[in-house]
A protein has these predicted regions:
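Membrane-proximal basic amphipathic "stem/tether" segments
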Residues: 17-51
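Basic, alpha-helical terminal appendages of large translation-related enzymes
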Residues: 61, 174-176
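Short, conserved active-site entrance elements at the starts or edges of catalytic domains
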Residues: 40-79, 85
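Short beta-strand segments
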Residues: 70-106
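Short beta-strand micro-motifs in enzyme catalytic cores
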Residues: 73, 170-174
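Active-site beta-strand termini and strand-to-loop segments that position acidic
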Residues: 94-95, 176-179
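Short, structured beta-strand-loop surface elements
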Residues: 4-5, 10-28, 105-159, 165-169, ...
């Protein structure tokens, strides 16, 4: 069934079923071990955004899950300054129907551009499990920030190291709420 013929509720059901499939990825243990290392961060910061969107589209996203063992999506935003469409691969956590994403920029001391895009234009879309779902971004701040960030660290422990590297600049954390 093509993506366009599905309701957003059906898309969420497909994503829920996809997320329910636990997968120890072929490279998961390696990624969890080398992911936080400076040489890997430097290398993957350049390569990941180029290859991950293509990998995520193989087999409705199942290949990326099989390869990495981590929940990945492609987020589609509108450029904050340019107004042009932008796409970025991200890891995510689920909170009910919502998606939680964080802009760590691999521990670099600046926010990634896609986070500015979401602040300027909160309407976005996520591509997960072979479907594209419209979402609205909400910046998470205050008391909710730490508990929500900890949820992401449980998925990818390297985020804790990225937080240390950023010093006094906490990464932007977003709740992506599916739209009707």
């Amino acid at each position: 069934m093509p993506d366009e013929t599905l309701t957003n509720q059906q898309k969420l059901a497909r994503i829920d079923a996809f997320d329910a499939k636990e997968s120890k990825g072929l490279l998961q243990s390696v990624l969890l071990r080398i992911g936080p290392k400076p040489w890997f961060i430097s290398w993957y910061r350049r390569l990941g955004p180029k290859i991950d969107p293509a990998i995520s589209r193989i087999g409705d996203g199942s290949f990326m899950r099989t390869l990495y063992g981590l929940p990945g999506m492609v987020i589609h935003t509108t450029g904050a300054k340019s107004g042009q469409p932008r796409s970025n691969p991200l890891l995510y956590a689920r909170d009910g129907a919502d998606f939680i994403v964080v802009g760590t920029n691999f521990g670099q001391p600046k926010h990634p551009a896609w986070t500015a895009n979401l602040i300027a234009h909160p309407a976005a879309a996520v591509e997960v499990a072979g479907v594209t779902l419209p979402v609205r971004a909400e910046l998470i701040e205050g008391d909710d920030w730490h508990a929500t960030f900890d949820r992401l660290v449980r998925i990818y422990p390297g985020y804790a190291l990225y937080l240390e590297r950023r010093g006094d600049l906490p990464p932007r954390l977003f709740r992506l709420v599916p739209q009707p």
